[in-house]
Amino acid sequence: MEKGLVSIITPMYKGAEFVGDTIESVLKQTYTNWEMIIVDDCSPDDGAGINVVKRYADPRIKLIESKINKGSSGARNIALKEAQGQYIAFLDSDDMWPEEYLESQILFLSNKDVVIAYGGVQRIDENTKEKISSPFPRPDRVDYKDLLKVCPICPSATVYDLS
């Protein structure tokens, strides 16, 4: 485990249309100590999403091509086995982060006894890229009992501290 490193876990299935935007949002992060592990989950798109990922020469971006479709959870688990970071962040291949997302989450996680940081989510029109709703509300505090009932936290808006 590398202290301070964020391992960004990105499952991809037929991701050619949006994965470039996803990667661009990571490249624009003000917090730059990250690795991005993208797992293509045996997409039936003749490698279109894989080709988009391969256009990026940044050594922090790693591509794993799964030969068996395991679903998004299975793809995340493949990436987790490769992750080297103190922090784990999930980001689906059709989601994007604002530029200061990682920086704000890591700053929050630097507080004593905090192991999970999460933020709100905003829907964006896939054609126009315009915001189509106000941000989904996020609870101020989530405890273990809340997580057992229903998880109010979006995976793509969550960072975990493994230390």
Where are each of the predicted segments found?
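Nucleotide-sugar donor-binding/catalytic module of glycosyltransferases
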Residues: 1-163
